[in-house]
């Protein structure tokens, strides 16, 4: 092999190794940030009722479900909150320290993100409250009222109820 070919070969090997190392580091970094989504039933029983597909203790996950009525316990001396979360099956316990979203309440759907500390206990770092498709934030609702009043649009129209819906309700009475 002549010296010119040798230097090209070294350059190609160097570039391929650089790309491989960069790809490996990217995959490793992304793997650290992947939070798999589970329902409370899947946390307890595994996905598709397969115990081999249960999240492991210490794994970062996201769990979505409904806050069980009567299970919200707040620590009076701190921002710690503990509540149960379920879907149609068994419930898991969520422990969270921080300010809960305004839409958080019992019987409401939420998504909690955190680390599974025991097989059925999630230490949440973030709690997101879900709302229905008709939700309008109060500030936006007020601004929309000001803009739409001159046009003759009623407040009920802004909350997802059309004139036809109101007529159907009145006709049913």
UniProtKB/Swiss-Prot annotation:
Q: Where is this region: Disordered?
A: 152-173
Q: Write the record's keywords in alphabetical order, separated by commas.
A: Cell inner membrane, Cell membrane, Cytochrome c-type biogenesis, Heme, Iron, Membrane, Metal-binding, Signal-anchor, Transmembrane, Transmembrane helix
Q: Which GO terms describe its molecular function?
A: heme binding; metal ion binding
Main localisation: membrane
Q: Which residues bind heme?
A: 131, 135
Q: Please give the InterPro entries that the UniProt record associates with this protein.
A: CcmE, CcmE-like_sf, NA-bd_OB-fold
Protein's UniProt name: Cytochrome c-type biogenesis protein CcmE
